[in-house]
Amino acid sequence: MSESVHTNTSLWSKGMKAVIVAQFLSAFGDNALLFATLALLKAQFYPEWSQPILQMVFVGAYILFAPFVGQVADSFAKGRVMMFANGLKLLGAASICFGINPFLGYTLVGVGAAAYSPAKYGILGELTTGSKLVKANGLMEASTIAAILLGSVAGGVLADWHVLVALAACALAYGGAVVANIYIPKLAAARPGQSWNLINMTRSFLNACTSLWRNGETRFSLVGTSLFWGAGVTLRFLLVLWVPVALGITDNATPTYLNAMVAIGIVVGAGAAAKLVTLETVSRCMPAGILIGVVVLIFSLQHELLPAYALLMLIGVLGGFFVVPLNALLQERGKKSVGAGNAIAVQNLGENSAMLLMLGIYSLAVMVGIPVVPIGIGFGALFALAITALWIWQRRY
């Protein structure tokens, strides 16, 4: 049954609760599945360099479908798009459980995630508006952060107990998300009847990319956020190999605990940025970006668990302080030039392309036999230099 949109819809309406629950379960599954599947690769004696390939097939789906998923979200009821996307994730996780190639199953999850992303943000504006919309976005981000923390840890802890149990828990989470999506009101499509000419859709998307790249502020933001998230994903995989070498700990849970420290730090840094940085003073965030690389370098040399926890939380604080102002700048300037939806789609393309590139370089470094500690040192140094170059470039323009 279709329901009309009411601008004064309660923040805790049935539909909004369903969206938040679905988002939590879907993000929980995403983060738990990564570490559960990494544990499966270890158990099945896949080479170490294959671990980042797992994430590469995931982000590859984002890149491949980037020009089209926004229109999919606008052409159908967003709650149903979310349900279909979570269904794809469920299919991918279940296929890994039943012994299908993990890279194939994880690719299916990536396709689902690519379709899910624009729908989950777009539906908030259809369920509520005004000050409630800001609060709804806050609830969405809070549920996502909680899911990242709990999902990452659950994936590692359950995998230490039994890999199949961890994978089944991920499939169960996606199944719960599908059920939650059923309770989202079937709202009218935002822009029905659009052309599905793939060439025109791709051309329109590329025009948005060109427009944002030609603007100095949005170009600066795109490069900065892409470098940050590319580095963040690479750090996740670096930790998986670094923990047994530097700390002598071989379980699956410890890397997830360390990743959780970064997520907690990002929340703290984001809060500080909201108070200390404005769109007019975005350059204040740049020293934090440079320090991320420096602290990663120092972290790579550690051999004790407590300093590792502290340094990773510091990396998260610096990361939150760095990336939040850049996101705000892109959303504000992009909204005026190509529209907020297109700006987010282009940003997703940039960030996932950076992830693909950095993970590819990291995988190659592991494949040729470079030890993980020197990889971490080089990674930190190169990131610091890249952000320094970006800052100099921004000041020139």
From Swiss-Prot:
Cytoplasmic side: 39-52, 112-144, 188-226, 278-280, 326-343, 388-397
Main location (coarse class): membrane
Domain of life of the organism encoding this protein: Bacteria
Subcellular location: Cell inner membrane
Side of membrane Periplasmic, spans: 1-17, 74-90, 166, 248-256, 302-304, 365-366
UniProt keyword annotation of Lipid biosynthesis present: no
Membrane-topology descriptor: Multi-pass membrane protein
TM ranges: 18-38, 53-73, 91-111, 145-165, 167-187, 227-247, 257-277, 281-301, 305-325, 344-364, 367-387
CDD domains the UniProt entry points to: MFS_MefA_like
Example of a GO MF term: lysophospholipid:sodium symporter activity
Gene Ontology CC terms, in alphabetical order: plasma membrane
Record's keyword terms, sorted: Cell inner membrane, Cell membrane, Lipid transport, Membrane, Transmembrane, Transmembrane helix, Transport
Gene3D superfamilies: MFS general substrate transporter like domains (1.20.1250.20)
Keyword Metal-binding part of the UniProt annotation: no
PANTHER family linked to this entry: MACROLIDE-EFFLUX PROTEIN, MAJOR FACILITATOR SUPERFAMILY (MFS) PROFILE DOMAIN-CONTAINING PROTEIN
NCBIfam families: PRK11195.1
Similarity comment: family membership: Belongs to the major facilitator superfamily. LplT (TC 2.A.1.42) family.
HAMAP family recorded: MFS_LplT
Reported function: Catalyzes the facilitated diffusion of 2-acyl-glycero-3-phosphoethanolamine (2-acyl-GPE) into the cell.
Protein name: Lysophospholipid transporter LplT
Organism: Escherichia coli O127:H6 (strain E2348/69 / EPEC)
